[in-house]
UniProtKB/Swiss-Prot annotation:
One of its GO terms (molecular function) is protein dimerization activity. GO terms for cellular component: nucleus. This is Transcription factor bHLH117. PROSITE patterns: BHLH. SUPFAM superfamilies: HLH, helix-loop-helix DNA-binding domain.
Amino acid sequence: METPAYDFDSLTDLPPLPPSDFTPSNAFTFPDHNLDFSFLDSTLSLLNRHHLSESTRLEQIFYDSTHTQLFHNDDTTTTTTPFLHLPDLKSIDAVEEPTTMKLFPSLSPPLPAAKRQKLNSTSSSTTSGSPTASNDGGIITKRRKISDKIRSLEKLMPWERKMNLAMTLEESHKYIKFLQSQIASLRWMPLESVYNTAGEVGETDLLKSLTRQQILQVLANSPGSRNVLSSRGVCVFSYEQLLSLKTMSRNL
């Protein structure tokens, strides 16, 4: 029996194939509008898609430009569609470098080792050098002031003896108290004596020739007399003051 021959001018004249030939065994069909996405997902899984999805720039390149190139079914297209490939990372960095550096400064390329070492040395010298120098200058100034005050106390003393710091402070305290008492006594002392004290005090010829003001001036300018008075804990006062003290003590 002869099989009849059919002549077809083009593929469009062929009879349609039964749908059962294109149906999978598990009866799962792919809609036409999800076909391109399923192919794209399977391709991206080979390229470690979970790493590519972290970069917004790569997602934009793959889902915009590649999608339109791979799945553009146009009868007028004469060139073959290229296969999915990774973009030029160097060109992407060159284009996106300013935006990346502005948004993520930590992702900017590291500085050279020599320049980084120079910056670190400059910052360390700036932060650690100035406070130490200022502190040293303040300590030196305080020590100088303390030394000047101690020398002033030593000059105030009526004697010239080498003493340590503790002895200098103790003796200066005693001598300052003596000076305060002596000043209070001289402030209320009469300038001229109103009593004849030749028989009671036992004045010598030298004392008789001097006035009260001259005698006080001699005592003030004599380191020996001040040393004796301060060491005994007494001060100079007049005869009038002595009589006043006796009168006050009797009335008490």
